[in-house]
A protein has these predicted regions:
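Positively charged, helix-rich recognition surfaces that bind polyanionic ligands
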Residues: 144-146, 159-320
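Hydrophobic (often cysteine-bearing) scaffold residues that line and stabilize catalytic clefts
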Residues: 17, 21, 28, 74, ...
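Short, Φ-rich (hydrophobic/aromatic) sequence segments
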Residues: 28-39, 81-89, 93, 214
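Acidic carboxylate diad motif detector
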Residues: 54-158, 289
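Short, surface-exposed charged micro-motifs
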Residues: 10, 120-122, 152-155, 182-184, ...
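Gly/serine-rich nucleotide phosphate-binding loop at the start of the catalytic core
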Residues: 1-78
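Generic detection of short hydrophobic beta-strand segments and adjacent strand-loop junctions
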Residues: 9-11, 137-140, 200-203
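TRNA-binding/sensing appendages of the translation machinery
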Residues: 11, 85, 299
């Protein structure tokens, strides 16, 4: 079957490319905020719903006319910023999520997405470069090859200052061989999860080491003069430590979910209301640490890819 897979690479833009990326982040944030304000104003004045197409037309006809510098960045990036705003707006109405917030330039994670058209995005594994709209060829660490059709590229900068690009590819995926083994999963706090046949997936102990480093660095930061050179150096160390924890955890979850999906045809787990549970301050950190949401998310899409059945049951369902 054909599936969408994302391949994430670290990129090393030169000074000119970094300026263009920063400009695109800023323009996307500006367009997101302006179209959100426009949508809010129309609804308050006329009680009319505004579609994402209306917002896109408003950007092209009004905003680009008033703010010429918007034409200096990739047009697909601006359109996708509007579509992201629309998705947040739809979530507010359909899923009763919080009302979309205006984006701040102080956000730690910055990103924009551009679409593939007429070969404007290309990955060259021989030269180790990625071609992107308005950036030309950017140096990259291309550690994984892929085959398939590029659909989009998301350029991001994390709080440690590193740049990445995530290439979304439509690729053919070979399903795993059928198995007659079925399993139930009990999500835990002491351990990540325990399967119905007694297998225990422990929480990673190595993360504790980095969490201790984090506490030490945060203590150091509180003693630094704000906006001093050492303050920013320590902030960067904290960001790198967070990144290390995030990467170790995600890599481990991929290994666990792959093993569970490979060995079982039907996988059953509890349908936990994680958002509500995180509101309990005594449980919040423990739940975030064991990453239930990310594990169940991975099990869900990997089951679809491999012809497996993943079922979430009510927490209080009497399985006996």
């Amino acid at each position: 079957q054909w599936v969408l897979k994302a391949y994430k690479y670290r990129i090393y833009p030169d000074s000119e490319q970094r300026i263009q990326i920063a400009k695109t982040f800023g323009c996307c944030r500006f367009v997101y905020n302006q179209t959100l304000a426009y949508r809010k104003e129309i609804y308050e004045k006329e009680k009319k719903s505004v579609s994402k197409t209306d917002c896109n037309n408003y950007c092209n006809r009004e905003l680009k006319k008033d703010y010429e510098w918007l034409k200096e960045v990739d047009k697909f990036a601006l359109t996708n910023a509007i579509y992201n705003m629309d998705a947040a707006y739809q979530k507010f109405f359909k899923e009763h999520a919080g009302y979309p917030k205006f984006k701040s330039k102080h956000d730690n994670h910055k990103s924009y997405t551009t679409n593939f058209t007429n070969g404007n995005i290309a990955v060259d594994f021989e030269t180790g470069k990625i071609k992107l709209p308005k950036l030309k060829a950017v140096k990259a660490r291309l550690h994984r090859e892929y085959s398939g059709q590029i659909k989009s590229a998301t350029v991001s900068q994390v709080s440690s200052g590193k740049y990445y690009v995530s290439i979304l590819v439509e690729t053919e995926h070979k399903e795993l061989a059928h198995t007659n083994h079925n399993i139930g999963i009990d999500l835990g706090i002491k351990d990540l999860c325990i399967t119905s046949d007694g297998k225990v997936y422990e929480n990673l102990k190595i993360i504790k080491k980095y969490e201790k480093q984090l506490v030490k660095l945060q203590r150091q930061l509180s003693h630094k003069g704000k906006r001093s050179k050492n303050y920013y150096k320590t902030k960067k160390k904290i960001a790198l430590c967070h990144e290390k924890i995030r990467n170790i955890r995600k890599d481990y979850l991929h290994k666990v979910s792959h093993e569970i999906i490979s060995e079982n045809q039907v996988i059953v787990s509890e349908n936990l209301q994680i958002k509500n549970m995180v509101k309990n301050h005594h449980l919040a950190k423990a739940i975030s640490d064991v990453s239930w949401y990310e594990l169940t998310r991975q099990l869900e899409y990997k089951a679809k890819w491999n012809g497996r059945k993943y079922i979430k049951i009510d927490t209080f369902y009497a399985s006996s």
